[in-house]
Regions:
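C-terminal catalytic domains of large/alpha subunits in multi-subunit enzymes
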Residues: 1-59, 104-318
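Conserved beta-alpha junction segments in alpha/beta enzyme cores
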Residues: 55-96, 230
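Conserved strand-to-helix beginnings and helix N-cap segments that scaffold or border functional pockets
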Residues: 99-100
Length: 318
């Protein structure tokens, strides 16, 4: 077969570090592509005006901006004396859930629940020179910057907690469920008390961090390099019904097997996959960019550019 595996090399020279074969075989095993084809053929044999079709398609997508300088992000984290945490990053929340993931990063680093973390809207006064929220990289870049800022504050807090709980080293300490843990056992020192004690000792409870994706490069002259931090893989099986008399169609189902990696939030990631499916269907079936003879964009409004709506959503997404 011609599916990417870890022996292959992309046109830019970067070697594949994982493969698409797993998602293909697991998708086929879960949904039985051969049986779905059989069902479509049986339907078509007895239907005069409607026809069903089914296709199986793999995908491989590199994560990072190919313009290397864009692969950087900053985060500003404040811990207040009441124990609350504020985070600012360059990521723009537009319904895709990136702020939820960033809040999860801070909450995990400080051993808090999400109610204790507030992610503020993007503001160039707090976070300057931001990279675009695009290329499926916003959560990676800004989440990592948030992690780095939280780690710096946490280490300073551990230096205070070390004496309060009589730990031999800060390496023996952790923050879980609002308490300091020593050697994985909960102590009586809670988060708010630790923060206040640190403040009284004039410890810095704020941090600005900068993250740049390591190990990536791309030469636009030779079109060679290592432009992506990693690749994600997936496979989709799509079934459609075409009304041959009226020239209409419906998407009956989309069945996916996608590489999530270690998902921070499966609900957000499922939503991203479902949204991507509908966007892809729109791109392939109805969206068309039209320019006139003078080069002016004519499809510049919803009245001239058709985008997917509720009726475009597949009947089943699995």
């Amino acid at each position: 077969n011609n599916l990417t595996d870890d022996r292959d090399e992309f046109p830019c020279g970067q070697k594949a570090e994982s493969d698409a074969i797993t998602s293909w075989t697991q998708g086929d095993a879960a949904y039985d592509f051969t049986d779905l084809q059989k069902q479509a053929h049986e339907f078509n044999a007895s239907s005069k005006y409607f026809r069903k079709g089914v296709a199986m398609m793999p995908v491989c997508f590199g994560i990072s901006f190919t313009k290397t300088p864009m692969n950087q992000a900053r985060a500003l984290v404040h811990v207040y004396t009441d124990g609350s945490v504020a985070v600012s990053t360059g990521a723009v929340e537009m319904g895709q859930g990136v702020n939820t993931k960033i809040a999860q990063v801070a909450a995990k680093m400080f051993g808090l629940d999400l109610n204790g973390v507030k992610v503020h809207t993007t503001n160039t006064l707090r976070i300057a020179n931001t990279s675009p929220t695009a290329a499926s990289a916003a959560a990676d870049l800004n989440g990592k910057a948030t992690q780095m800022a939280c780690e710096a504050i946490r280490d300073r807090l551990f230096a205070v907690a070390k004496d309060l709980v009589e730990a031999k080293s800060i390496d023996n300490l952790s923050l879980e469920n609002g308490f300091v843990h020593r050697n994985s056992e909960r102590t009586s020192l809670d988060w708010k008390t630790l923060v206040m004690d640190a403040h009284l000792q004039r410890v810095n409870l704020s941090e600005h961090s900068h993250y740049a994706t390591p190990g990536i490069n791309f030469d636009w002259t030779t079109a060679k390099g290592h432009p992506f931090a990693y690749h994600v893989y997936g496979t989709a099986i799509v079934g459609v019904t075409v009304d041959c008399l009226r020239g209409r169609y419906e998407v009956d189902y989309v069945k996916c097997c996608h590489d999530f990696g270690s998902s921070m939030n499966t609900s957000v990631d499922y939503g991203q996959i479902e949204g991507g499916i509908v966007q892809g269907l729109g791109w392939m079936t109805m969206e068309e960019v039209v320019y006139d003879a003078d080069g002016k964009l004519r499809s510049n409004a919803l009245s001239t550019y058709k985008v997917p709506d509720i009726y475009s959503i597949p009947k089943e997404i699995a």
